[in-house]
Amino acid sequence: MDIEKAVLEILLRKIRYERVSIHFSDTLSDYRDVSKRCFLQAARNLADSAEDENEQLYNWAREALERQEGIYGCILEVAQKILKIKGGYICYDIRNWSEDSQFLHWKEISSSLGQDIFMAAILANNNPGKEEISTYLCMPFPKIDFEDFDKLLGKDGHVGLAENHFHLKGSFPVFMLNWTCLMNHIGDGNDFFHRFKEYREVEILIEHEDMNRNDIFYSSICAAAYRLHLYEIYSGVPQELQMPFSYDRDIDEVDLRVLQDRIEYYRGQLEEKWDYAKGQREKGLDYALAELWDVCYDKAEVSIVGERYFLYRCFNAIFEKDTRFRYEEKNLFYKYLLIFFRIRSEMVQTNPMRGFKNFQIYQDRKEDIIDYYPEYQKHVIRLVGCSLRRWQNISTLEMRLSPKTTADETISRIKEFDRDIGKSGSEELGNDYFYVLHFPKEKETGIVELKPRNYILREKMAKQIEEQKRLIDLEMNDLKYWGRIPRVRGYDTCSGEIGCRPEVFAQFYRAIQAYAKRNQANWVHWTYHVGEDFLDLTDGLRAIDETIHFCELPQNSRLGHGMALGINAKKYYKMKNYKILLSRQDLMDNIAWVLGFSSEHGIVIPVDLSGYLKKYFSKLLKNVYVDNVKEYKKEESDSGVDQEQAIAQVAATIVSIDLSEEKEEWQLYYDAWKLRGDRPELYLEDEQPEMSDIYDGALRGGIEEARKNKTCRAYYKSYHFSNSVREKGAILEILDIRDDYIELVQKLQEELMGILTVKQIGIECNPTSNFKIGPFNRFEQHPMLRMYGKNLYKYSNRMNISINTDDMGIFQTSLEMEYVTMYVALLKSKDENGKAR
């Protein structure tokens, strides 16, 4: 389906809606004939496609549009290749999973365009009854219809799937709920697109440099007007009662009030139906749901069924050749879909850009529109807690959410979520459904005198130590006196790793672990997002090691993502052209860690490589620490001390080799690195922090020798509190990557995986999320297959891993789909010799 995918992406995502004419035009496109110039211009953005090939693609597209109901026939044709209706459900129609590669093609198409239009098209072509329609439209995704998967996916009485990495606010149908809200409140005067500072559709931005937020808002007004007009037509509203609508003039903001009044009129009719059915009055969510209200009002999916029903009715009118849907209405629906997909591409990750920052932009927009409307916000939890569990056999669901400022506020919020899901209390939820609190990482904002790195976040987490102690106390009381099962079962971190090392959270993790252990709160467990986003593979591995040691993760903890463990080092550094650009500080830390970790774990480094790394380290150390005594020089000068003598004293204090220990400079620096889990303020004085200073996990155990060493303490103090060290350390350097260094990195990966296996620390893998963010481009290259790759790779391990979704609303996936994706990818994969595995 590569050809179909390319054509549909061009016709639905790359064509501007202004270039589609409602009336017949020789120069513009319509639903059954796209202009050649427009098509070829859009096709230039296709990877690995020459101009002649694009011409062929255009000819194929034109033939496809002519032999069917234009673009709508093309959509149906793709839907029929992968979907079927069976047993009252929409199912994947894959007859031979071991030979048929259609599923992975479908995954690419549905990631780009979603599944809603394809499900609506195949339904419209089958024209089911009203009761069946409501069931079909409530399905968040097609069902897997393959007997061999029944046991794996927990069907027919088998144990279900565990969802161990599930961000609550990133897992609802992000676009559909926001779009429904927008189409029903377009005229309310809210700044719906306040976070849309930049467009994610890069190719469109290049082509239309004058685009701005007003453009995307204006197109939304047009879509809302098109939607209402088409709704009135297929609903049979007499023309004299329809909202005034002209095919011959542009819609503008002057029409907004009239448009919103009419929308509210139809929503009001929905509210009357609710009043009649339930004896109470609530706001209608979507006027387009009108005909299905009596069979959908009590469904968890009621908030998004209206838009799906609208799509279904339009497709049905076209396929059934409804005379009310003329040429003009078909073009109007095409224009609507173009705007629909244009805005969808700004809320669901569809672009090919990798890295966590790209994903984070989408993540930050996920509630931009519904933020203004509490009645839609409460359906986020219903969609996540009820709908997704209803359509998948999930045995346990760990829902991650960010805590509020205080423990009482957090508990109150959780109780509200439980009520929104439709449960009366925690007793009914049992052990299979609970919350994990995740704390967002934050980059440091700059250097502040006498403040450590990331001081703002450190101060927040210091306050959270007390709040989470109180939360544990509250849950213990509920369990002891009321028998209520604790709702918060674990702690995690989230958001981007770059610029926020595990050391920032170390004190919090140690303090809460100790408190939970003292109070026998054995339901509290630990995980940490790490090794997902990194500027160098070695940097990602060091972060994993820092998490293990600084946070002192206990047995049966987990790491979120951990991709650095299993990434193919050769392919990674080849992709980077064998050059790494990092700050001096990070490079210095990485080299010292590579040397120190290898020494401690018996990994032999070739003499030539060892010399290369030590020489590079010495250069960095001199540039950042030895030569950076200007601020000390000024301080000593002001106090009347001889400047040269002062410089010599400070340099000796900071970087001199402790001859009594006969250690090299990198060894002392590596020992100082081990102190980074300690509370930085304890090192402001030159005195050694004593064990009596340990409070709330301020000092970690097992590193007393490094703590005693004056040179190590000076390194650590300068790392945090020396302005010149931090400024010089931020300067960027290029490291050339050698073949023997790559081989060393592979050994470091293997050793770390072995350590985690022995410690029984598992990895929460997220196939689609990792594929979108990580540095690999095929699912069979997923790092999990080295973490647990029995009979697959020479250097694979037997770690505890789980498959999860991460942010399924942004990545357009499901837990079943993640399992099937990896299954099919493995069936299609080849070994180094090109043979099937």
How would you name each of these model-derived features?
Residues M1-R837:
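Metal-cofactor-binding active-site regions of metalloenzymes
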